[in-house]
Regions:
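Ubiquitin-like/PB1-type beta-grasp interaction modules and other compact soluble beta-rich domains
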Residues: 2-217
């Protein structure tokens, strides 16, 4: 007879399966997901802030430009804007100078516009008129009002170099349409916002000397 196996009558081993507590996995899952979400949101925000640096459109958030400005209504210079609100980085210090150092992409690159400057104080300047913000003690001035009974238009005179402008140079640009969209193009510039008859010479702003008095550059 053949030799019987020793294990023939040995009972099969019982396989024990450990049932995991469903709450154990969840204890770390939620914090990890929250952390991942926060990190992702931070990265997206950082990319948004620095997007203009990658595009190369100036001014960048690292730029710090200045432009002397003045508002001329029918030959009369208006007081400099005193409201120093600065929600996006294009503002004034009540000194007759536009400080252009955007810290948001909404005011950098192609967005560094005349509209960005005026909206910082709740003001509006466009082809139809100038509406000062609530903290500026001045009245609205519409193009339709004209100058002394003569038709007039709101316009922008822009000098690339304020020093040359002060010496009597002609403006590099005269803009009579889409004023709000005009973009600041460089440092130490001069810009006059004027309501004057078409063809009348637009003078440079009287605040150009302030550019040599700046302390925040």
């Amino acid at each position: 007879m053949g030799k019987a196996s020793r294990n023939k009558n040995k009972p099969d081993a019982v396989k024990v399966t450990k049932v995991a507590n469903p709450d154990q996995g969840r204890s770390w899952f939620l914090p990890v997901m929250v952390a991942v979400t926060l990190i992702g949101a931070g990265a997206v925000g950082l990319l948004a802030v620095n997007r203009d640096s990658n595009s190369g459109e100036r001014p960048l958030t690292s730029d710090h430009w200045h432009a002397a400005y003045g508002i001329n209504v029918c030959g009369e210079w208006q007081d400099p804007i005193l409201d120093t609100a600065d929600p996006e980085g294009i503002h004034t210090h009540s000194d007759g100078v536009i400080h252009i150092h955007p810290f948001r992409t909404t005011a950098a690159g192609q967005n560094a516009t005349v509209d960005a400057f005026f909206r910082a104080t709740g003001s509006v300047l466009n082809d139809f008129g100038y509406q000062p913000g609530p903290n500026i003690p001045a009245a609205d001035v519409l193009a339709a009002d004209g100058c002394g009974g003569e038709p007039a238009v709101w316009q922008i005179a822009y000098w690339d170099n304020a020093i040359i402008a002060e010496g009597g140079a002609e403006p590099d640009q005269i803009i009579t349409e889409n004023l709000a969209d005009f973009r600041f193009e460089g440092d130490i510039a001069a810009i006059t916002f004027a309501l004057l008859p078409v063809g009348e010479d637009v003078p440079p702003p009287p605040t150009i000397p302030q550019l040599s008095q700046l302390t925040d550059i």
